[in-house]
Curated annotation (Swiss-Prot):
It holds the Pfam family TrkA_N. PANTHER family: K(+) EFFLUX ANTIPORTER 3, CHLOROPLASTIC. GO terms for biological process: proton transmembrane transport. Residues 400-519 form the RCK N-terminal domain. Belongs to the monovalent cation:proton antiporter 2 (CPA2) transporter (TC 2.A.37) family. KefB subfamily. Pore-forming subunit of a potassium efflux system that confers protection against electrophiles. Catalyzes K(+)/H(+) antiport. It is found in: Cell inner membrane. GO terms for molecular function: glutathione-regulated potassium exporter activity. The gene is kefB. This is Glutathione-regulated potassium-efflux system protein KefB. Keywords: Antiport, Cell inner membrane, Cell membrane, Ion transport, Membrane, Potassium, Potassium transport, Transmembrane, Transmembrane helix, Transport. The chain crosses the membrane at residues 4-24, 29-49, 55-75, 87-107, 115-135, 152-172, 177-197, 207-227, 230-250, 262-282, 284-304, 324-344, 356-376.
Amino acid sequence: MEGSDFLLAGVLFLFAAVAAVPLASRLGIGAVLGYLLAGIAIGPWGLGFISDVDEILHFSELGVVFLMFIIGLELNPSKLWQLRRSIFGVGAAQVLLSAALLAGLLMLTDFAWQAAVVGGIGLAMSSTAMALQLMREKGMNRSESGQLGFSVLLFQDLAVIPALALVPLLAGSADEHFDWMKIGMKVLAFVGMLIGGRYLLRPVFRFIAASGVREVFTAATLLLVLGSALFMDALGLSMALGTFIAGVLLAESEYRHELETAIDPFKGLLLGLFFISVGMSLNLGVLYIHLLWVVISVVVLVAVKILVLYLLARLYGVRSSERMQFAGVLSQGGEFAFVLFSTASSQRLFQGDQMALLLVTVTLSMMTTPLLMKLVDKWLSRQFNGPEEEDEKPWVNDDKPQVIVVGFGRFGQVIGRLLMANKMRITVLERDISAVNLMRKYGYKVYYGDATQVDLLRSAGAEAAESIVITCNEPEDTMKLVEICQQHFPHLHILARARGRVEAHELLQAGVTQFSRETFSSALELGRKTLVTLGMHPHQAQRAQLHFRRLDMRMLRELIPMHADTVQISRAREARRELEEIFQREMQQERRQLDGWDEFE
């Protein structure tokens, strides 16, 4: 693809995303399905704007690479060790059982046994990109089903290596003798990457961060992600696995959050490009000729994987309310099938249209997942939000709540308990089904659902409520909900949780003035107690705390125009000097009235 063609393709991708995704969200079918439909529209079987699908699909796999790096940042080695049983237990069982069942079914449709084995393994894999994206959208990240789903996906990435090695053996084209020297060098290189990453990454990033230039830090992050991906690819291993390991090695470093911030925009764009590329690869010609075969294949594939996953979830002890979420989110074929089937085709394992039929089946199965998860959501909503008695009204709470609390994790629970203790009528919306189960056991009126859906908010009583308290874990969800409330329910007083200064700036820019940084107040209170233990009078420590709070809020507002700018550093230093001057000016006055308490007490 020439430079001008590549630029044109980039413009088309951006246009497709801008046009299709908002429309898909408005129709309620989700961003992922919007990307897939946009790919079909601009691909060779749609309007034909882009024909070189394979090259773009290979490039777009970087979206999965960036996603796995961010996931690695969220998992320290000890947490990964805790997941070892679910990774090598449930993960291995899912791949082996699904592959065996699907291979057997393929043999019944005139596939040679070698081709059926490869086809079964490829179809047994799930889409890492789609599953993780949907798990984040559905709030499954921290739930039991989400952790188990991630374990299965991680094992599938590990299974890529032996699966690719199996293809030439099945084709009868493998060398009679393994090159043990070559294999040994690859193992040594992999171990060297682990050791080097363990002891070199932190000092390198410390040196880069000392420069104070944000762009260099971002460049270093991109270099790490792309470099580790290319290194693993050169070893014949999974690129996504390489970046995941790099993320895990930095999970306990002081640069974890900065790394995540630097990489997040690239991850989102490239993931969108990946889904568009998958849509472009859908061969509508094969679909038209073999429509019945493809439809039956998609239904059978999804049904077999759901059955296997549901049974494994039950054996593993996953709550009944979460089993369908776990099974549904992993029910599709995955991007690895494109690589495995291409390798098998080059070894002439497939005959006629067999490879094309399998790829169409995989692509369409990916398109069914967002729709399937919507059905699961509706089923869960009816099961958990429905009437407990026959004469009760269905859905959520129809007694005109004063406050709607969105999110009922540790932060939201404190707020909810305080409001209920003061006899306030509240409706709580939570999209983590395990949290809904737990809180309902203790008598809380918590309802399952995604609060970014306008219909759910309206059903929850948003039109009659006075306030909404947003305590979402994800900043993106918080800002989306703020926008929805301002547009559809402008009368609501919006109060929000901010994870840090970045989110606080975004809330202020959106016009939300009532927010709380989750660690700020508790840190200030502990700081005040520390001052007292160091000999400062309680009144003096209290005033120091109040001054710091006022100055910090003033600085927060002043820095909005230069949000995420290097000028912020110099302004912060100036504010620190100003705070010291304020303390010095008032020390004399404080010493003269040590036993007094002011109006702010």
